[in-house]
A protein has these predicted regions:
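N-terminal acidic leader/helix
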Residues: 1-25
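Short, charge-rich amphipathic interface segments used for partner binding and complex assembly
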Residues: 26-62
Length: 62
């Protein structure tokens, strides 16, 4: 299991999505939105979705 934003970046890049914002809070929010969209369209598995959200949650809290 991945434990950092690199996992999420690689996951998003598989679908040609690159997220960058100089404000980390905004960037995490944008990543969250993109992950939700990928999952809602059935492009990523439930496990990938959960893993990504746990990483984002930990990053937002810490």
């Amino acid at each position: 299991m991945a434990r950092d934003l690199t996992y999420i970046n690689k996951l998003l890049l598989r679908y040609g999505i690159y997220v960058y914002d100089k404000d980390m809070g905004n960037m995490l929010t944008l990543m969250e939105m993109e992950i939700k969209e990928l999952y809602s369209h059935g492009l990523i598995s439930k496990e990938e979705y959960i893993e990504a959200f746990l990483i984002l949650k930990r990053r937002k809290e810490g």
